[in-house]
Amino acid sequence: MELQIMRLLIIGNPRPTHVGQHFLRAAQSLGWSVEILDVNAAYEAPLWLRRFFWHLFGHRPVHLEAFSDSVITTCREFKPDLVLVTGIAPVSARALRKLKKDGFRVVNFLTDDPWNRQHHALWFLKALKLYDHVFTPRHANELDLVRHGVVSFSYLPFAYSPEDHYPPEAVTEADRQRWSGLVAFIGGADPDRVAVVRELVKAGVPVGLWGGYWRDHADLAAFAQGHADAETCRRIIASAGANLCLVRRANRDGHSMRSYEMAAIGGCLLVEDTADHQNLFGPDLESVIYFKDSADLAAKIHRALGMRESERQILQNNMRHKVIGGGNTYAARLEKMLLILDA
């Protein structure tokens, strides 16, 4: 019998750019009754206390059990058909056992790699095997999940949100003059990303960096542009000479949220060469430009910056067609989840 999910409870971050927010808007677009519990409540405490719990208790949120109790209470009041937990969210093993006993179906969309040292948390790994199903956007997790004792899991990639990821309303001549000569990167200064950008700067590549913590690196601070709002990000992506699409290697990602988001917005993408990206974008120069490592990237950047506008437009049109025409919205991901759960 096909399960028709009409009531969805999301456990996630409702702030803009986060997966929890994207799933919330996707469920609303499908006409579902949906609520979201903000995981940030589990971490609200003085900085010293957060650090104490983080370092001495294995990345444990200060209010793990209290937040978990709020999940149980909300489920009993809202009575969702499905509970969707996003990533390494503060839902304890104890809470999952209670929810299962009460008959609630709880799944996890594993936004981060729990075997990445930066995210490793024993309390979460204890809970992970108790989910009814785990969806992961990285193939590298599949064998880990088997070894960990997770019985039911599926690969499900990231997506884009049509409400947020679309071409800018207008790209002005000032935008082009400001950004067309730059290689743009939008995202935080993770160590892997810093290493790549540092090599570009050493090679004399003109870069523009938007996101957190870039100013913390003295040799990159001059290229840091701070944070940009959603519309400005769309204009940057559409106007930049090229946009870097990097995976998080420490996370063993084959693609990232940006892989879908930037493609939906449109622009010239320099994409890390992975199997996931090849499956999404096709061969080199069909819709994106691939690079294999930092040395290869410098050469590909010169290729991208030297392209005629007509060439860039062909790549962009092909890229947007592959992503937008391929059922890659977060609403489509929700529908795919239901098909898998009903199989």
Region locations from a protein language model:
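Nucleotide-sugar donor-binding catalytic core of glycosyltransferases
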Residues: 2-56, 63-73, 78, 86-94, ...
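Short, amphipathic alpha-helical "lid/cap" segments that border enzyme active or binding sites
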Residues: 68, 72, 294, 298, ...
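Short, conserved structural micro-motifs that define repeat-unit consensus positions
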Residues: 85-87, 99-106
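A short, histidine- and acid-enriched strand-loop-helix "catalytic/donor-clamping" loop
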Residues: 107-119
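Acidic, glycine-centered active-site loop in nucleotide-sugar glycosyltransferases
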Residues: 279-288, 292, 300
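Conserved acidic donor-binding segment of nucleotide-sugar-dependent glycosyltransferases
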Residues: 288-295, 303-309
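A charged, aromatic-enriched C-terminal amphipathic alpha-helix characteristic of glycosyltransferases
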Residues: 306-339
